[in-house]
Amino acid sequence: MSDQLQMTDGMHIIVEALKQNNIDTIYGVVGIPVTDMARHAQAEGIRYIGFRHEQSAGYAAAASGFLTQKPGICLTVSAPGFLNGLTALANATVNGFPMIMISGSSDRAIVDLQQGDYEELDQMNAAKPYAKAAFRVNQPQDLGIALARAIRVSVSGRPGGVYLDLPANVLAATREKDEALTTIVKVENPSPALLPCPKSVTSAISLLAKAERPLIILGKGAAYSQSDEQLREFIESAQIPFLPMSMAKGILEDTHPLSAAAARSFALANADVVMLVGARLNWLLAHGKKGWAADTQFIQLDIEPQEIDSNRPIAVPVVGDIASSMQGMLAELKQNTFTTPLVWRDILNIHKQQNAQKMHEKLSTDTQPLNYFNALSAVRDVLRENQDIYLVNEGANTLDNARNIIDMYKPRRRLDCGTWGVMGIGMGYAIGASVTSGSPVVAIEGDSAFGFSGMEIETICRYNLPVTIVIFNNGGIYRGDGVDLSGAGAPSPTDLLHHARYDKLMDAFRGVGYNVTTTDELRHALTTGIQSRKPTIINVVIDPAAGTESGHITKLNPKQVAGN
């Protein structure tokens, strides 16, 4: 009598495929039809982090992808859950973070005829505009190759978000186990090196050598590349001033003598040759137009050829992955050495010192209530002594001021709203950074920004993650002193509840909460929160009149020209 065949099903196959591709964590929200998939993943040793909202789970997966160069995995239920995660998927794609969102879905035969199935939605086609790629698996024997394609697409070339649709009938479909295991694909070399053209590298070095006022701009693509040593060696060898975009802070420490961050506007307006390294000439750099010299020449190191000439003509495009491009640039520099003119560095240093003095006066002024500057000065003091901290930052004024005030000392330690300027990334990024690194995380949040994902503090407490959340509470969106123009006694459109005690939320989840009104209280609470490694909220009471509308990008917010 022959032995009975062992059977398996779709959800077991996809979990085994994840394991064989070294995926060790899933972020998600369970429900129909993926609950048992999450249970089985956990049973097989994959860490499952359950969230209160799919958007935050997706943000955590994206943060993990940025930090590890491996796709972060987000698991959602069908239709509404899928749509909740879609913002995070789009955000990953826009920012160039590798992420795979896996969603269960309803019966294709019913959905395609629009016959009213449970949570009916054509999810794959809904995802396509917002993802680097979107795939649907219609038969269980394709689960292995589908995941392999998703992994490769998410990390190769410019990284991004990939959507993988798993209908319920495919997850439940049974197959003979040994045969099913042969369909699993282990992805080899998922992100092959893309070498730049040697002539482009030579031209780039030649142009930099002729420059009188060169500048290097480091973007988050440079941070993602993990080319920290090559970038440092190149910058220090040629003595070229550099300007880090916000998530590139720390590739070289912000206190480095060649950092031009404190003279940003002057450097951008006066540089004659600018080398963009994993940075795009988008709105964050005024598209290379307003505030820039008309005759600036650009060198652009980017993995995506379509990014070249997007806003300004690029004199020397160097297309390839950043690590390979920087290796080539270093080799060429050693053959054709040069040093940036001292006069340019000296002029930048004068402007840096002048601006630093102005900032010092703001930071050292004691006020009651606190404002952004003296409160962030206290935070800076503590983080200077805790340089391994991962810093998550979102808000308007809270983001803009923290970016300028708080120095970073190590690469990939700062996560923020990024290219899209998305509010709500805070708790998801904090959880993703903590789970991925095992290190303490400090999330500096505006009170409005915190509200987008605040319920994830339960997730933080449930997993006992070492996350300290510092909420700058001025009782409003931008500011808390809005005026009711209706005269009806209603809150202003920009007002939140004044005197809210966000620290009290921690009482519900057995975390730790502090309410602080002075810089000394803030220093003590933040130091204690970090050292304790306990989930902590610090409610920082600041002046409702502190801040400006839309932070540092007021010009992007149109004003009415008629009426009130």
Predicted regions and their residues:
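Phosphate/pyrophosphate-binding active-site segments
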Residues: S2-L5, Q141, D295-G395, T519-T528, ...
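A structural motif corresponding to the C-terminal end of an alpha-helix
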Residues: Y130, A378-Q387, M506-V512
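A glycine-rich phosphate-binding loop feature that marks nucleotide/adenosyl-phosphate handling sites
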Residues: D165-V170, A396-N397, D543
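Conserved short loop/turn motifs at secondary-structure junctions
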Residues: G219-Y224, S364-T365, G446-S448
